């Protein structure tokens, strides 16, 4: 609506409008790097759990995950992929399936999925990371305080907001501005993927 009226607008992430300021991170690169680091720690069998695949962010994370799998010579068909909304009542059967298929590490698309998976695993008596490791492709303060703390991709929300604000000011002042900006990320390796 705002884009159609050429109202100055900024968003986090990418969208299909060229007249909107867009600030995002390299989600494909982040997923590839996190997965490669986990492969480097010895993990070979993964489950990737993503929400709605109509979102660009989830498609990018999917691509990055598979790039790492293929670059590191892992068989693509031995990795488990689950996409779409995962209802709470079906989470138990998903966990049972992952355990029976000997998945070593679950990579969740975001913090909410990670918290749901961790809660279910702990409720069923599994030990993280001894029985199964967990990582998230999006960080939040909650993942810092969980026990064990969760390995994650960290993108500074403050940096994203500041960049949107900076570009918006440039636009409003009639100065040159960037329509699309990519913000750096950091991989935080924490106890949820520790291997002895």
Region locations from a protein language model:
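Hydrophobic alpha-helical segments within soluble ligand-binding/sensing domains
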Residues: 23-48, 63, 67, 87-96, ...
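Flexible loop/turn connectors
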Residues: 94-196
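Short acidic capping loops at alpha-helix termini that bridge into adjacent secondary structure
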Residues: 44-46, 76-80, 128-133
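An alpha-beta-alpha
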Residues: 32-74, 180-193
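Flexible loop/hinge segments that line or gate small-molecule binding clefts
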Residues: 1-29, 112, 138-150
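Short beta-strand/turn micro-motifs composed of small residues
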Residues: 13, 24, 50, 83, ...
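Short beta->alpha junction loops
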Residues: 52, 79-88
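Alpha-helical structural signal in soluble globular domains
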Residues: 1, 5, 60-72, 116-124
């Amino acid at each position: 609506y705002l884009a159609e009226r050429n109202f100055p607008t900024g968003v986090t992430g990418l969208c299909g409008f060229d007249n909107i300021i867009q600030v995002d991170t390299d989600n494909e690169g982040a997923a590839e790097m996190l997965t490669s680091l986990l492969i480097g720690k010895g993990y070979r069998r993964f489950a990737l759990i993503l929400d709605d695949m109509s979102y660009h962010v989830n498609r990018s994370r999917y691509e990055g995950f598979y790039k790492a799998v293929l670059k590191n010579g892992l068989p693509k068909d031995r990795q488990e992929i689950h996409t779409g909304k995962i209802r709470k009542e079906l989470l138990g059967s998903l966990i049972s399936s992952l355990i029976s298929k000997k998945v070593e590490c679950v990579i969740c698309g975001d913090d909410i999925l990670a918290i749901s998976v961790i809660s279910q695993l702990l409720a069923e008596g599994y030990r993280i990371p001894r029985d199964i490791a967990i990582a998230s492709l999006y960080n939040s303060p909650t993942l810092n305080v969980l026990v064990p703390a969760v390995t994650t991709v960290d993108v500074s929300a403050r940096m994203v907001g500041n960049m949107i604000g900076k570009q918006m000011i440039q636009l409003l002042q009639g100065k040159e501005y960037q329509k699309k900006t990519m913000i750096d990320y950091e991989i935080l390796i924490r106890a949820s993927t520790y291997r002895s």
